[in-house]
């Protein structure tokens, strides 16, 4: 924020751009904290208003907390004063909490949510996009390249499929054009670490190709192939839930399988330890066996949870 503020002021660019930043919801302890952080951000950005202000990374617990702190009153006041022009939120939560947040406030205008061709049914996925479309709320997409994992170290099985495409694209083009061809996606945010990546994204965005039916079939086949590389065959059906000990079995397996699939244990560990409450992680399993009897895939769920616990390991528990 300090860098952006200085750059925009020194170059007189403020009127040429829209500024978006986020409120650190997890840091809020009392109602006055919302305005405190907003005023600090306005100071850093050297502006008197923020165009798009997001309540950032809302989890179920964070949402319940900030509602009690009357965050919606804060948003109303900030909109009325002009400190904020448009409001939204970002979230990696499940669909039920996502819908609760959407329905709680009629002034949401945009939501930042995770989506890519692997994550159609992960977190809120396509169901979340359906809800945004229903409410006429703008959608901004994060993780279009899955943190770069969809374009780096491509498994041979996946590359072989891409090579069969009638219209040749790079892995970056496949991932971005998949999203840009969806009528429920308004804006795609992709992290960039170099000027070369900036130029590459500009070039792709300036020449978006249509995704044909055969292209869609190929993308689905690539997604299926990636998923054969997972650690177990959990389908996230939910028959094992709720666990009597409170273990979040589905999300424990989701993060484990994504880490195995993309060969990215560190990235999945960050998600695992930051998004799953401590009491709901794999090591809370007591091997009661209730879940095994209802699993359609006949997974030995306690044994699989033990694998999850060993996979992430104690060395990752600093996130």
Residue spans for each PLM region:
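Active-site groove signature of glycoside hydrolases
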Residues: 42-63
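Iron-sulfur cluster-binding cysteine motifs and their immediate structural context
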Residues: 239-257, 290-307
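Glycine-rich anion/phosphate-binding loops
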Residues: 28-36
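Beta/alpha (TIM)-barrel catalytic core signal, keyed to glycine-rich beta->alpha loops juxtaposed to Asp/Glu
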Residues: 58-235, 239-251, 266-275, 282, ...
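Short acidic capping loops at alpha-helix termini that bridge into adjacent secondary structure
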Residues: 14-17, 48-52, 85-86
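Short Fe-S-cluster ligation motifs
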Residues: 261-290, 314-319
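N-terminal binding-site loop/beta-alpha segment at the start of enzyme catalytic domains
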Residues: 1-17, 74, 80
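A short, structured active-site edge motif that brings together acidic residues
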Residues: 15-27, 53-58
